[in-house]
Amino acid sequence: MTLEHVDTDYHLEHFLTGPLLPDREYLYRRTSDVMVETVAELPPGRVVDVGSGASQELARLAQLGWGAYAVDPSPHMLGISQMTREETKATVHLVRAIGERLPFANASVDMVACQGALDHFADRGAFMREAARVVRPSGRVVISLHNFEGLATRLGRLLHPLARASRLHHCAEWPCWQIPPDHTFKGDWPTVRGLGGPWLQLERAYGVSLFCQVYGWGHLLRRLPNGLAEGLLRRADRVAYGRPSWSDVIVSVWRPVDAAAASS
């Protein structure tokens, strides 16, 4: 598989559509924090972020002592990573490549991260195989994936007929249960549990955020005092953490199968 087989023209505009209401802002912020916190559980080493986007998480990890590598097939997104690198003064190495064919040696990476990008890949199984190949036996693979069968999507489908008949229909710029056309598969809890195939074993998983983009929720939060809105979002997030099947985003942590067998 080569760059010719994938979309290499991805832009931020493809992702950041519509107004950034408090529920979406919290989801992005909290997912970023959880990814950084999960990687930072290991001693600093070499971290590769595949589908790295703007590389904001990598910049934070580089400042914590990690050797940070941003991998993305899109020249535009690598340009955004370059801007992040210049703004933060962090050492982040930029690599143009695809997740299905990582340009790293076997067992040469301590952590492989993939935040909100796997459902854009042409072949998710090929990526998981590559991640297992390049990660050390003591390393981990951390993936965040949008959950299209969480509480938000279920409520969205339930409320949609009412929303269409009322002024609430304008409150969601994209119905939260509809899979965007640039996604290659539907993310949900059963799919996440099966991602590892024969290469990686699921170590743990947790959820991030509840109710993001449910009709009217973000607009209601925007009208509340900031402290109250933040408190509601945090309470919902605490519930989501222990119930990934309910959550808006699922974060999963994987270990190589051989390492998992050795420790059992």
Regions found by a protein language model. Give the residues of each.
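A conserved beta-strand element that flanks and buttresses the S-adenosyl-L-methionine
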Residues: 113
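A C-terminal cap/extension of S-adenosyl-L-methionine-dependent methyltransferases
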Residues: 163, 190, 194, 204-264
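Conserved class I S-adenosyl-L-methionine
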Residues: 1-53, 56, 60, 77-80, 142-169, ...
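Class I SAM-dependent methyltransferase SAM/SAH-binding core
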Residues: 54-101
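Acceptor-substrate binding/catalytic loop of class I
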Residues: 174-191
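A short glycine-rich, Lys/Arg-flanked "PGG" loop and its adjoining helix->strand segment in the class I
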Residues: 125-137
